[in-house]
Amino acid sequence: MKLVLAEKPSVAQSIAKVLGAAKREDGYLEGNGYVVSWCVGHLVELAQPEVYDAKYSKWAYADLPIFPMDWQYEVSAGTKKQFGILKKLMAREDVASLVCATDAGREGELIFRLVYHKAGCRKPFERLWISSMEDVAIKEGFENLRSGTEYDALYEAALCRERADWIVGINATRLFRPFTGRP
């Protein structure tokens, strides 16, 4: 059995139709040797500063800049149910491997990998890389799956972008907020 993880429900439904996974369950579709589920965007995100150190719960200029030494991730508040479903699916004994079917690009790769790592999954995964949701493109994509490790550099680039955004965003917001007159 392969677990296919798409970025959004609509994409998962298109993929499931092509693969013959027609049995609907809560948060996924199953059939024909496949379980097809989805992420609903970013299920896992970087933790807020106060998770790293309680002193960051109060904004103080003296605490800037904030540079985490060990990056921490949390399941997004509004996606805990779907994350729980994905974690259970990844742990199923009959699921031997996964297919990353998130959007073809840096962010899609990041979305899949963060869920995969946060769920503690160690099963092998392959990458579906398609730019069309036409049935023929999906079928061809599944006939040409690539090893997930071929996209490690793309994942690393996404991590760098995400962490750089966090560093600039958190520090700039805390630095300049007093000058805006907003609490």
Predicted segments with their positions:
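Functional cation/ligand-contacting sites centered on basic and imidazole/sulfhydryl donors
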Residues: P183
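Intrinsically disordered, low-complexity regulatory segments
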Residues: M1-F179
